[in-house]
A protein has these predicted regions:
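Sec-dependent N-terminal signal peptides of Gram-positive bacterial secreted proteins and lipoproteins
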Residues: 2-28
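Bacterial lipoprotein signal-peptidase II cleavage site
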Residues: 21-52
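Short amphipathic, basic-aromatic surface patches that mediate peripheral association
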Residues: 87-89, 104-123
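Short coil-to-beta strand junction motifs in C2/discoidin
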Residues: 100, 119-130
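Solvent-exposed serine/threonine-rich low-complexity stretches and specific carbohydrate-binding patches
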Residues: 144-152
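Aromatic sugar-binding surface patches on proteins
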Residues: 153-160
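Short acidic/polar inter-strand loop motif in beta-rich domains
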Residues: 178-188
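Short beta-strand elements
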Residues: 186-218
């Protein structure tokens, strides 16, 4: 009788041990499945992010003058780039992309001196009048001039225009930049809220003298 009780007790212990073992296996399998699901989700998110990044890089900016980029003039930092012609709205305000050779862009931001006018360093400076002149270095004659429009693109605001220029060669780009005061922009001058700087009264001139231009097949 005593032996039967011992045998029964051993049987119960064995059954309990097997049940615990099966339970542990189930937990491990579920955890592994969850981890696999998380890894798959992470991979998918990473892939989507990569695709999105590739889609946003749909154009290549070309420096007008590599040796004279990001020039400091007065309170401004000025650079010039170009890329494929683009369509803009409202229509009719500039040359159609189909009729242009490229889109010429002036990136103009406030530098440290520009903070005296109330801009943050690196901020886009709006309401400037930006006149451009493209000069053939071989003849010193203008081959195109006008006034840039201000506009927004996916990478931020800038000044620009679609330009027609078919002839390869060495050119000089000259920008003449008039202050926002011309368009009625005002500055606070009181002791409590005023700025310490003053708008420039004569146009600021920026020159990109070494533009080695080659027409592109966009």
């Amino acid at each position: 009788m005593k032996n039967k009780k011992i045998a029964a007790l051993l049987g119960l212990l064995l059954a309990g041990s097997m049940a615990f073992s099966l339970s542990a296996c189930g937990t491990s399998s579920s955890s592994s499945s969850d981890t696999s699901s998380t890894d798959t989700s992470t991979t998918t998110d990473s892939s989507d992010s990569s695709d999105s990044s590739d889609d946003s890089a749909g154009f290549e900016e070309i420096q007008v003058d590599e040796d004279n980029s990001d020039q400091e003039v007065g309170p401004l930092t000025v650079n010039a780039v170009y890329f494929q012609p683009i369509d803009m709205e409202p229509s009719g305000m500039g040359l159609k992309a189909a009729d242009a050779s490229f889109h010429l862009e002036a990136d103009i931001h406030a530098n440290q001196k520009g903070t005296e006018l109330g801009y943050g360093k690196g901020d886009f400076v709006p309401d400037l009048t930006v006149n451009y002149d493209i000069i053939d270095n071989s003849t010193n004659e203008s081959v195109g001039s006008g006034t840039f429009m201000q506009m927004n693109a996916s990478d931020g605001p800038h000044y620009g225009a679609n330009i027609k220029l078919d002839q390869a060669g060495s050119y000089k780009l000259v920008l003449s930049i008039e202050s926002p005061e011309k368009k009625g922009w005002m500055l606070h001058v009181d002791p409590e809220t005023g700025v310490t700087g003053k708008f420039w009264t004569e146009p600021l001139e920026v020159t990109f003298p070494n533009w080695n231009y080659t027409p592109q097949e966009w």
